[in-house]
Curated annotation (Swiss-Prot):
Keyword Metal-binding set for record: yes
Binding-site list for Cu cation: 73, 123, 126, 131
Gene: petE
Name listed for the protein in its UniProt record: Plastocyanin
Subcellular location field: Cellular thylakoid membrane
InterPro entries: BlueCu_1, BlueCu_1_BS, Copper_blue_Plastocyanin, Cupredoxin, Plastocyanin, Plastocyanin_cyanobac
Species: Leptolyngbya laminosa
Length: 139
């Protein structure tokens, strides 16, 4: 009886150790959780700029633009400054409708379908004032 109990205890400990190792491996190997990055349209200081102007994301991350100061604002992607210089991609990402109310927002989730690279965007009414931003998608 003692022998059976000892074998049973040893097997239980071995099984527990195996489950713990596999669980730890899966936790380490699981992809990072997607993040949401908020970009203010119009800086808190009152300047006509995106804040922050440069954002780096990974596939699955979301960029959310929030109307903050000095509206109206919109988000247009420059078709000559997106990966592949694709007008179709730039149009797909752009939000040409003007946002007038504080707190209005627009967001894009950069899925794995989007090519890695730098995406340049601007606010059409304030581009001449330097309201330009960049998103870098890392693969």
């Amino acid at each position: 009886m003692k022998l059976i109990a000892q074998i049973s205890r040893s097997l239980s400990l071995a099984l527990f150790a195996l489950v713990l190792m596999v669980g730890s491996f899966v936790a380490v190997m699981s992809p990072a959780a997607a993040e949401t990055f908020t970009v203010k349209m119009g800086a808190d200081s009152g300047l006509l700029q995106f804040e922050p102007a440069n954002v780096t994301v990974h596939p699955g991350d979301t960029v959310k633009w929030v109307n903050n100061k000095l509206p109206p604002h919109n988000i247009l992607f420059d078709d000559k400054q997106v990966p592949g210089a694709s007008k179709e991609l730039a149009d797909k990402l752009s939000h040409s409708q003007l946002m007038f109310s504080p707190g209005e927002s627009y967001e894009i989730t950069f899925s794995s379908d989007f090519p890695a690279g730098t995406y340049t965007y601007y606010c059409a009414p304030h581009r001449g004032a330097g309201m330009v931003g960049k998103i870098t998608v890392e693969g």
